[in-house]
Every structure is written in structure tokens, then in C-alpha cells.
Swiss-Prot record:
The gene is pheA. Pathway: Amino-acid biosynthesis; L-phenylalanine biosynthesis; phenylpyruvate from prephenate: step 1/1. It comes from the Bacteria. One of its GO terms (biological process) is L-phenylalanine biosynthetic process. This is Prephenate dehydratase. The record marks 176 as: Essential for activity. Its EC number is 4.2.1.51. It comes from Bacillus subtilis (strain 168). One of its GO terms (cellular component) is cytoplasm.
Length: 285
């Protein structure tokens, strides 16, 4: 089994893949989210594993838009990973980490550790990299430089770096959601037995073109009177002009034979365009 993921190695996406699939799955890194999804469509890999949402930074719009407008792959699973940011240095700098000349990482990682950096390195410049994994590799490859990197445990072990400060992120409850995509919506796969799971269904709903008054209220009512709990509703532009949006709706329930199909039929009767994006298990560490 091959799993494509947003690379490079030792990023949080790679860590999530490794935490989810632990039975000999081959991990294949891709440079971008579209390349990863395209690889699954082309059959190069069995699954595409890409980020969907971060608790602090919000949704990964590229993932959502590519699934809606370019490659409508079904969501067959979801993985939520807690995000722990650490300060790493080359082993030769372990005892002098407080005198770093520069700190490398992805822009999001640096932003998520602002308080720690302001307190301990108020005048040290930052160097932004394409990913935390790429930044860790650079630090590992340049022991002659007095530099550090913000990254995860996997980056430390992969590139033989020392963790000098753990959990330096500003907020302890930061998590990232990743979706598992496959051309085969009925594909089965084994996950780490230590993961907990719950069912989830995700829909795309586009309001009627005539934009009737109260249309969104009627959409929500179709779920409300059926006691279907929505964990998320988010709008995205349809890319057909200002003021035109579709909605991504997460339902905390397995796709059944009555309630969710009934809600979908009611929405279609209202003139909405409705698409099932996936009915799947959501896994958490």
C-alpha cells in the first residue's frame, strides 16, 4: 500500500501519516497538495494524505478548492494530530543554544511560537523555509552555522538534531486535521490500533442561483429538525463571481439510509446543488 503525502520528510503531515498507517505502508512525498492529489488520481499511490484545517491558522483553502473544482476525490478517512513545536539544534550546539544567530522554520511554526521567541530570542532574526522538515534538514546539513529550527520529534530523529526546548508553542490545544483521499470510496485500510475514531459525513452545498431570501436558514433547518449535529459549516467562493459561495458541512454522524439522504433530498428540492464529499471515520491520537 502506498500513501502519498505533502512532503518533504519529517513534516507534521509525514508525522500524521506515520501515526495513522503503521503496517508497512510505503510513504511517498510530494512537493504540493495538487501533486499529491493528482498522484492518487493517476494511480501512483493508493491514498493522498493532505492537510485540511489547523486550529490556529484555519482551513487549508487549497485542499478544499482543489477537491471541489479540480479533482473530486472522495474523503475516505480523517486524522487529527496534536501539534507540538520544539526548538532543535545541531548536537554540536546543544550547550550553546541560548546564543543562536538565526532560527529557521515554516512561517506558521514561527508564528505559533511567538511568545517563546519574543521572551528568549527578542533580537534573533528568522529565516522562513517551505516546511519544518526542510528547515530541520538545513540545520542538520550546516553544523558550522549557529542556528536552530522549530520542528517536531520526527524531524529531530530523522536529521539527528537535539531538542533543547519542548512544547514552545503559544497554545497547547493546537491540532491539525488531515484528510485521506482515494479514487475508491469503498477502499479498506488498517490504522494504528491506538487511535480512537468516530464517524463523520461531509457535504458540499451550493445555494440556489437566484439567492432566495433565507436560503441559508432553510439549509440549516434541514439538518436541525432531523437532530443532525453539524461540527462545521464553512463558505468558500465558487469562483464564478462576487457573492457566489458553496458551503462545506461536516455532520457528526455516519451516512445512513434515512436522515442524511433525506436532508440532501430536501436541500435539492430547495434548488441547492448537493454533493457527498465523504462518509468516513475520523481518527485521533
Amino acid at each position: 500500500m502506498k500513501v502519498g503525502y505533502l512532503g518533504p520528510a519529517a513534516t507534521f503531515t509525514h508525522l500524521a501519516v506515520s501515526s495513522c498507517f503503521q503496517n508497512g505502508a510505503e510513504h511517498v512525498a510530494y512537493r504540493t497538495i495538487p501533486e499529491c492529489i493528482d498522484a492518487a488520481v493517476a494511480g501512483e499511490v493508493d491514498f493522498a494524505f493532505v492537510p485540511l484545517e489547523n486550529a490556529l491558522e484555519g482551513s487549508v483553502n487549497l485542499t478544499i478548492d482543489y477537491l471541489i473544482h479540480e479533482q473530486p476525490l472522495p474523503i475516505v478517512g480523517e486524522m487529527t494530530l496534536p501539534i507540538h513545536q520544539h526548538l532543535l539544534v545541531h548536537p554540536s550546539r546543544e550547550n550553546a543554544w541560548k546564543e543562536l544567530d538565526k532560527i529557521y522554520s515554516h512561517s506558521h511554526a514561527i508564528a505559533q511560537c511567538h511568545k517563546f521567541l519574543h521572551r528568549h530570542f527578542p533580537s534573533v532574526p528568522y529565516e522562513y523555509a517551505n516546511s519544518t522538515g526542510a528547515a530541520a534538514k538545513f540545520v542538520s546539513d550546516h553544523p558550522e552555522l549557529n542556528i536552530g529550527v522549530i520542528a517536531n520529534d520526527m524531524a529531530a530523529s530523522t536529521y539527528e538534531l537535539k531538542i533543547v526546548k519542548r512544547d514552545i508553542q503559544d497554545y497547547r490545544d493546537n491540532h491539525t486535521r488531515f484528510v485521506i483521499l482515494s479514487p475508491d470510496e469503498n477502499i479498506s485500510f488498517e490504522v494504528n490500533s491506538k487511535l480512537s475514531s468516530r464517524p463523520k459525513t461531509t457535504l458540499m452545498v451550493m445555494l440556489p442561483q437566484d439567492d432566495q431570501s433565507g436560503a441559508l436558514h432553510r439549509v440549516l433547518s434541514a439538518f436541525s429538525w432531523r437532530n443532525l449535529n453539524l461540527s462545521k459549516i464553512e463558505s468558500r467562493p465558487t469562483k464564478t463571481g462576487l457573492g457566489h459561495y458553496f458551503f462545506i458541512i461536516d455532520i457528526e454522524k455516519a451516512f445512513d439510509d434515512v436522515l442524511i439522504p433525506g436532508a440532501m433530498q430536501e436541500l435539492e428540492a430547495l434548488g441547492c446543488k448537493v454533493r457527498l464529499l465523504g462518509a468516513y471515520q475520523s481518527y485521533q491520537l
